[in-house]
Structures are given as C-alpha cells and as structure tokens.
Amino acid sequence: MASNPPSAASPRRTAVSPGADRPDGPDPAGQRQSYHAGRLEPEQLATTWVEQFARWFADASTAGAGVPEANAAVFATASADGRPSARTVLLKGFDHRGFVIYTNYTSRKGRESAENPFGSLVFPWYTLERQVVAIGAVERVSRTETEQYFASRPRGSQLGAWASHQSQIIESRDVLDARAAELAARWPAGTPVPTPPFWGGLRLVPDTVEFWQGRTNRLHDRLRYRRVCTADRWAVERLSP
C-alpha cells in the first residue's frame, strides 16, 4: 500500500552527514576490513557447542593466532528495568554447563545478574575473523568452586579482591593503595588469604551459542546451536548475516 503524502504541517527533514559534529580525526565510516580467512559449514561443526567452542578457543589461544587474550569476552547484563551494561571480563572455565567468570558480587554485573539473571558473552577473535556469542541465564557457581579458584590466584589478585569495593565511587587511587597496604599487613606473605564472602563465580548457562565466521561482501557464515528442550537437546541453524 502506498503511504500517504506528508501534510502541510509535517516537519521537513534535513539530511545531516554522519559525524558532522564530531571532532577531527579518523572517520569510522571509512574504515573497512574485507574478511576472507575462512568459512564455516554445518558439516564442519562439532556435535556439541562446547566441543565446537573448545576447537575455536584452542585456535585463538595459539601464539600464531595473534589474539592477545583469547579468554577475554564482553559480558552484557541488564538491570531489573532493562537498562543494559557491558564490560570486558576473562573466561575462567567452560564445560557443558556453561561459561564461568569471577567477580565481586556487589559490582554492577553482580547486582544485575542477581536482579535480572540473564546475560550474554561475546568472544571477539578479530585476527581470526571469528566471533562467538552466547546468550542465556546467569547463576552463581558453588562456593566450593569459587574457593578452589580463589586459592589458585596470585596473592596480589587475592588481596585486590578484598581491597576493591567494585563499581563504587572512590575519592582517589590513594584509597585503593591504602586498603591494599592494610590487607597485606593483615595477611603477610605465606599466610593464606581467605575468599571474600562477597566474591565468587558466575556461570552463563547458554540457550544459544552462535559461531560467526567473517566472509567476503559481508555475507558471513553464522551457525547457531539452540537449546530446544530441557533435556539438553540442541538444534543447529544457519542464520542470515
């Protein structure tokens, strides 16, 4: 059906060039990368998403891949009223149950995961022209898992977990340094540092895991594992790029 012509009262729209008010510098609209590193077909996929992720994670973790931190991912959450937030985190484990990260539970991601327990992880492996996107529910890992992982951390990281009241406003860096010094005196070298009660693991339990491979002309390959029932049965689907 043809749309009605604008009335005399309709405001006239003026075309504005993208970025007209931005500061001088590189123009993001002019930056283009052609993708041609590989392809992804259904017959190439592993039987399960976790096996496929393990393959790609191994590829990204090799020195020749040029990926600085293969376990780095963007973790997106949202508040109870739907306001999103995102940040880069480090993956610390994965298996058939999902992907595990660790954080301060009083941080923004910790609070949002409690009040709106859903999230997404994006692994951007740029040099391989690959991306993995997982979406699903977020749950806390067991205290046993948390304590086992915390015990494996470097002592400085353990003290840092106690020192940082993550996501809270502080007056200066001096506040952090003073807390760190106080905690180092409380637990001197050789003394086990206990796991903070406000710190622990989050597991993203995926409903979908999408594997993206860049292709020429923006006609990328997108293959998705999707949970189809509670019995852990999965469908594999190709998505239009």
Swiss-Prot record:
Region described as Disordered: 1-35
Residues involved in substrate binding: R32, Q33, S34, Y35, K92, Y149, R153, S157, R218, L219, H220
Keywords (A to Z) from UniProt: Flavoprotein, FMN, Oxidoreductase, Pyridoxine biosynthesis
Biochemical pathway: Cofactor metabolism; pyridoxal 5'-phosphate salvage; pyridoxal 5'-phosphate from pyridoxamine 5'-phosphate: step 1/1; Cofactor metabolism; pyridoxal 5'-phosphate salvage; pyridoxal 5'-phosphate from pyridoxine 5'-phosphate: step 1/1
E.C. number(s) listed in UniProt: 1.4.3.5
Binding positions for FMN per the UniProt entry: 87-92, 102-103, 108-109, 131, 166-167, 212, 222
Top enzyme class: oxidoreductase
Pfam family, one: PNP_phzG_C
GO MF annotation terms: FMN binding; pyridoxamine phosphate oxidase activity
Gene3D superfamilies, A to Z: Electron Transport, Fmn-binding Protein, Chain A
Gene Ontology biological process terms from the UniProt entry: pyridoxine biosynthetic process
UniProt keyword Repeat present: no
Catalysed reactions, as listed in the record: pyridoxamine 5'-phosphate + O2 + H2O = pyridoxal 5'-phosphate + H2O2 + NH4(+); pyridoxine 5'-phosphate + O2 = pyridoxal 5'-phosphate + H2O2
Cofactor(s) this protein requires: FMN
Family: Belongs to the pyridoxamine 5'-phosphate oxidase family.
Subunit structure, interactors included: Homodimer.
Function description: Catalyzes the oxidation of either pyridoxine 5'-phosphate (PNP) or pyridoxamine 5'-phosphate (PMP) into pyridoxal 5'-phosphate (PLP).
Protein name: Pyridoxine/pyridoxamine 5'-phosphate oxidase
Organism: Frankia alni (strain DSM 45986 / CECT 9034 / ACN14a)
